[in-house]
């Protein structure tokens, strides 16, 4: 078996105080998750609601599941009963649906607003202006079953570490702007989710409070 235990501790040991780890377990078997769980890891990230449902049914109840992939509004109802955080909110429509479905289960679902800062068109997320527009509308203030806890983004897929760092900096500056304008008195708005296996070491130097690491811990994905 892949050395999940050793890899996990290596990643955790490299994170500064105050940075949490989302172990990205999509396409990895339950025994890998159980190995990380046995070492104290509790936050795991998935991006397919059907795969997630199977894992939720068969793994410990105190795992905090984060949804990290593109989420269609019509799929929210399947994860609303148990999801801990949805990191990939990229529209007001999706936010409304999360609030609606969470209400049915009398839950408050934590969410992050996903930004699109990277150069690739393939990455989803809100442009900075679209994010400002969503927040300016104020509609989210009328959603008692959703708690906006911060921002999420992916840097461009490049070997240029300066570019990656500048994109993380741009996200960090935008976080400060949004925090001051809309969430100054809201301690829950505190998360900056950026950094993955190939660039989390840069992200933690540029404002990240939450890194999403899979391959470095679990090895290549098993499709």
Residue ranges and their predicted role:
Residues 208-223:
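Gly/Pro- and small hydrophobic-enriched strand-loop and loop-to-helix capping segments
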